[in-house]
Amino acid sequence: MSFLSSLFAALAVAGQPAAGPVTIFASRVLDGKGGQLKNATVVVDRGRILRVEPFKVDRPTYDFTGGTVMPGLIDIHVHATAYLNRQGRMHTAADGDTPVQAGYAAAANSYRTLLAGFTTVASIGAAEDKDLRDWIGRGEVPGPRIMTSLEPIADPSLSEAQLREEVGRRVDSGADLIKLFASKSIRDGGAQTMSEAQLRAACGEAKRRGVPSIVHAHSAASIKAAVLAGCHQIEHGVFADKEVIDLMVREGTFFGPQCSLVFRNYLENRQRFEGLGNFTAEGFAAMEKAIPLAVAVTRMAAATGGLQLVYGTDAVAGAHGRNADDLLCRVRQAGQRPMDAIIAATSR
């Protein structure tokens, strides 16, 4: 299967004038839901797929004979505005980079992500994501469609009423979804930080306002609390067990475990992060220990029938453009069937 063929098709369509149909022929067309057609033509008009013809039209606009075309990939967990600064370190507000430099870096991140075949991402963690989302949406800069949570809600001291207010403030400011922290970082052990009641208040308000809630949760206890609270999606889950995965199945909760990219990126670029916040010797040791656990959880999740398994990488500074790495990890290390991995990354 050729990811490149899919990418070229997407870029070709994006570069066409608004008027007039574009026809894309490929020897194999995947629908993102498990089905496929051989020797088919995708017909696109004004940026929208009109139909798929089960034959080769005369003189297609783009001919990918021998290649595969599939829907654009979706990464449900990135940090689009996180980048490495001029000193080769993770950008922080105090590193001297100007807003213009930060903006160009964010645009470069998005372009790299698009070139990797990802046409939709959820960027969950920064207010700056909103401007990037809007610029891409207007066609001013190339990049994937962005959904953003703006700033995450991470303060465990907030009351239920305050959490509802925080959710409402973000939605009113243009958030497409809400991100909550129900546990500590993996670098700090991943223990639960918010109660089920707090999560119910926040996730309930998000649902009332018509946006999904995505919860950072590593420990089994924090995952269980978020699922029972009715939250829409769990991210990470390094310490998830069969009990909480089965609970997610029963409750219809979406689950986005990271197979390895986020941890490997931090470890491979240790000197770029070390000394910032919880990027300590202990923090790096915790991430190294997390890799086999994350692969095992991904394997368990992939083998669990009925689980709403989505695809998210937690791509941060240094990882943009490598978003497909975890697809390979899911298939090669976690044993997920290739078509199931594609479905998770295109249709859910």
What function would you assign to each model-found segment?
Residues T81-L84, V121-D131, K184-D188, H218-K224, ...:
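Active-site environment of divalent metal-dependent phosphoester hydrolases
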Residues T81-G103, Y111, P142-G143, M147, ...:
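Active-site gating loops and adjacent loop-to-helix segments of metal-dependent hydrolytic enzymes
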Residues G103-D129, G143-I153, A175-S185, P212, ...:
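Divalent metal-dependent hydrolysis catalytic cores, especially in the metallo-beta-lactamase
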Residues L4-P21:
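Bacterial Sec-dependent signal peptides at the C-terminal "C-region" and cleavage site
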